Structure formats: structure tokens, C-alpha cells
């Protein structure tokens, strides 16, 4: 009886009590890596829509305080903060065309591999 009353009230009032999708953090990884110049740190964060699985936000960062001291020591990073996709490199920011998260993360890890081999930038 109670369920029928709730359904009647919600339909009469036009309420939508269906579960709304939420943006949920699905990846939260951090790893220390060795570099030609000291130790670095990799950070990967991904937030997805719980209903569709679409990636809503991401953050990829490579930090090494011996390579770069500005921008919280972020040498390289990609994110979608402020509503647009962009790349951070040594304190400079540039807009990027977003090829999809999988392709972007491959690009990021290729760039990090090259940076790790350099003694300085």
C-alpha cells in the first residue's frame, strides 16, 4: 500500500525519484618513478558518470622537483579543469584537442618516458 501511495504522490506532483547518475572517482593512482634527475611522481585520477561510464574529469600529472620547481613541481600534466582540455608543461598551459582518454593517457605516458631520460629540460 505504501509503495502505491508514494508512486501516486510522485506521479501527481511530477517528482522524479529515480536515481540520478553521479560523477564517481574510478581511478586514483600515484606512483614514484626513477628519473635520470632524481625521483619523480606520477598521478592519475579519473572521474566517470556512474550511469553512462563516460569520463567527466581527469588529471594526469608528472612531478619532479629537480626538473621544475614552479607549478607545484608539475613538469607535465593534462586535465579538463576549468571546463576545457589542456596540457601543462613547465608552467605553460595550452589548449588541446581531446582524442579520448585512452589516446591522451598513451600520449602522456610516452611523453613522461622521454622526459625521464633527460638530465634536465
Regions of interest found by a model, annotated:
Residues 91-121:
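Short, compact, well-ordered microdomains
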Residues 4-84:
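The feature represents the first ordered module of a protein
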